[in-house]
Amino acid sequence: MKTISVDHLARVEGNGGISATIDGKAVTDVKFSIFEGPRLIEKLSLGRTPEEDVSMSPRICAICSVSHKNAVLRAMENALDVKLTRQAYLMRELMHMGEFIESHSLHIYYLALPDFVGFPNAIAMASKFPFEVQIALEMKHYGNHIMKTVNGRYIHGENGIIGGFGKFPTREELVWMKSRAIQFMPFVHKTVDLFCGLDYPGLPESDTMYACCEPGDNQFGFWGDSIALSTGENIPRDDYKNLTNEFVVPHSYAKRSRYQEKPYSVGALARIVNLGERLQGEAGRQFAKYYTSKWKTNPFYHNPSRALEIMYSFERIPELIDEYLKLEEVAPAVSTNTKTGKGTGLVEAPRGLLIHHHEVTDGLVSYVDIVTPTAQNAEDIERYCHLAAQELLDAGEEDKIKNHMEIIVRAFDPCISCSAHMAEVNQAPESQWENSLDDLTREQTPIFIGVGNPGCSDDGVGVELARQLKAVGIPDVLFETEIENNEDLWRDDAERPIVFLDALDFRETPGKITFLPLQLVLNNTSLSHKILPSVSALMNYPQLKNSYVLGIQPQSIEQGQNLSSSVRQAIQDVLDRLDN
C-alpha cells in the first residue's frame, strides 16, 4: 500500500492537501484535507447586535468578503423584515460584479492557465503570454476599484449596512466605471475565446448534480431566494438544509455536504449548466457558440464558465449604472424596529453557492449558520480525483496522478479559508498507525524524539517510549532536552523524517495510538501539544513537511502518578512494531 500526496496545494487560496491511497491496482481512498485553522465566526457572532454581526461575518475570508457581506445583509434584512431600496439593490449588485471580475480574472489567468499551457506558474508564463498576464492584472485592479468605491474598501468594506449604504458613489465615479467597463470588452472577448478554446483533459468525466441560486424571472444572476438544482428541483431559501445535509469527516476542518447521499457541485460551472441559456447579449452569443453537453461532466470546464461570467459582469455593469443614474434621488438606508426574527441569505460567491442563516432574539444574534461553496464542493473534489487517479493507474500512468489531482482541485478554485470556519474537530483523524509507521521506516531511518513530562503520569509517555527504544537498540533516539541546540538536527539540508513521541489528547480511549503529520497536529486546536509549536519554529519547511507525531491517548496527566496500564501496553505495541 502506498500514498501519493500533495501536502501543500499550490495556486489555491489557503492551506490544504490532497492524497490518494493505492493498494495494488486499486485506488482505495482519496482525501481532500483542509489544514486551515477554523474561523469560529458562527460562535463569535453570538450575543452581538445585528450591526456587529454584519461587520464580523464577512471577515471569515478576505478573498470573497463582498459575497459574505451581501449574504449576511440579505439574511439579516430577511430576519428583520427590511425592504431594500432599488438604489441600494443596484449598488450591491455592482460591488458584487466587481468581486466576480477580480476573483475570476485572477484565478483563470494566474492560477489555472499555467496548468494548460505548460508553465509552473504565472511568472514563468509571462514570457510567452505577456498580454494575458498584463490584462488579467488590469481586470483585477478594476474589480478592486469597484469594490473599494462602492463598499469603502476592497477588502472587508464597511459601507454596506442593513437597509442600504452609509454613502453612495458619486455620478462621476459611476460614469468612469461604466466607460472603463466598455473599454475592457475587446479584451474580455479575447479571454472568452482563449479559455473556451483550450484543449481540456478528458479525465475525469462523470455526471454530477449542480446547485446554484435561482435569480427568478428567467434571468441569469448571482443571488436569489431559492436554490435551483440541475435535476429541475427548486429549494426555498429557508429549506437550504434539505440540500446541504452537512456532516464532518475526520481528516478536514471543513464540513461536507451531500444531497440525497450523493456529492454535488457549486460554482461557475453550476451556474452555466443551470442558467447559461438565460445569458443575453454578447455573453449569450458566446455561450451558444462554445457550450456543449461535455461541460456537464468535466470539472475543468469551470474555467471557461468563469470566462463567460467575466463577460456577463462587464456587460452588466453599464446596465446597473444606467438604471441607477436614472433614479431621481438617493434614498436613505431603511431602518426597522423589529428585534426578533430569523432569515436566510443566498448569494453566489465566485466559487459557488454561499448560504448565511442568522437568527436574532431580543435584538441580539442567537444563532448563525454559514455554508460555504468549498465545503459543498469537497465531496465532488475527492470523487473526481478518485476517478482520475484510478483511470491513470489502470493506464499505467501512476506518475501522473499527483499532478492531475492538483489540477483538478485548482479547477474548483477552493477558498479554503472560508471552508474552514465551521467544523468543530473533537477527534483527531484516526489512522492505521502501524501501516504509516511501516511505510516510513521502510524507506528511511527516522529520528525519534521523546517529548513530555515524566513526573505527570501519562504525559511522560513520549520520554518513556524514547528510553525504551534506546534500550532495545533503535538508532537516533533523542529526548526533548537534547534537541534545541542540536545543530546537526536543524541544519538546512536535513532530509531525514522526524517522529515526535508524545501524549496526544485526541478524545479517544486511553492507550489509543495515532500517527499524524506534524502540520496537521499543529493546526488542530482540539489536540494537546505543548512543546511542538515551539519546536516547529526551528524547522525549515521541508523538515516540517517530513515530520510526524506518534501520539498516545493519555488516561491521566496528574502530577506524581505512574504511567497507566493502557499507556504501558501502547508503548509495548510500538516497541514490538519497530523491533520487527
Protein language model features and the residues they cover:
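Short small-residue beta-strand/loop micro-motif enriched in glycine and branched aliphatics
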Residues: D53, S366-V368, E558
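A translation/RNA-centric and nucleic-acid-associated enzymatic feature enriched
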Residues: H356, T361, Y367
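A short interface-forming secondary-structure element
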Residues: I370-T372
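N-terminal catalytic or cofactor-binding beta/alpha core of small enzyme domains
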Residues: Q432-Q555, Q561-N580
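Active-site bordering "gate/hinge" segments
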Residues: M1-R351, T361, T374-Q432
